[in-house]
Amino acid sequence: MISVARAMTDSDSLVVSTVDRNSDMKFIWPEKVYFRGCTHRSIPLLDDAAFNERMLCQDDLTLLKFGLDFFMRSTPFLKSFWLTEFGLVMVTDALTEYAMRIWRAINRVHLGDTDAPTVAEITRHINHLSGRTMMIPSIYSGPKNGQYPILNKMHELFTLFATGKISILNHEILPEAALLHEQTHDLLDRLTRDLPLFLEYEDGPRSDPFTHVDRLGKLRARGEVVMYACVEPTPVPRSVDLWEHMSEMYAESCYWLLQRETPRNMIALMDFIHVKTGYSTTTNELMGYMRDRTSTIDILAFLFELTAGDFTWNFWALV
């Protein structure tokens, strides 16, 4: 009970940190943005799952996830927002996270961990969190032939390691693993090169090779390769409203959609604005706003200027 009370009082403001793929280590790196806490809640307790679940079901992170998910479903972005025991996490690409967890599971199998997850368990977990499927068919097919070499190869390697047919230290597998790594990154680069989601947070200096919450301590103790490179969390001052940051992100994303000059995307954007606000606009108006990037942000920011209660009402009215 002491730890619960402390968690509820130590930090009740939004905390943002990132984990990115810019690393020299030759593995697949997830790029994430963590939103911990919110306007009136604390960082989730890592050692009390029941308390975490109750808190996450009640706080503004759940509300924020609803809104972000609604927007993400209306765009071609590959990013997704996951509500986990560690808070709300924006994952750049679910395939990257999937691959990382498979490599981690391989490592655990090699170390004799009887609790290492199977591919099926990892798949179900990622599918549930991301709302995307890691099974075939998947959006992660090859660009032309509709094949799934990346997913197939990851599953094949995991099976070989898990059954002991290949040792993780076997040098014969290293070239194949390196090729898989390069193929995966090439595919991810093609998929995400034109799909940015803008966040106005600067990355700080790199710290230890694990996230600032040492949730990987057990992995390190077992001798596993810690597949994270991280930055220190960037606190958002209490004077800055959460919705202000989200409106900036939304407006920047809308700006990118307009830059694409794709009528389908613009029409979808106009429909969304009309349903959410009752305001009707035209393609010419939206394109006219592009002459001034600042104006675009200012004009579209009102979409997230609703109070939490109003936003909840509007969101459920939409769905």
Swiss-Prot record:
This is Uncharacterized protein ORF61. It comes from Ictalurid herpesvirus 1 (strain Auburn) (IcHV-1).
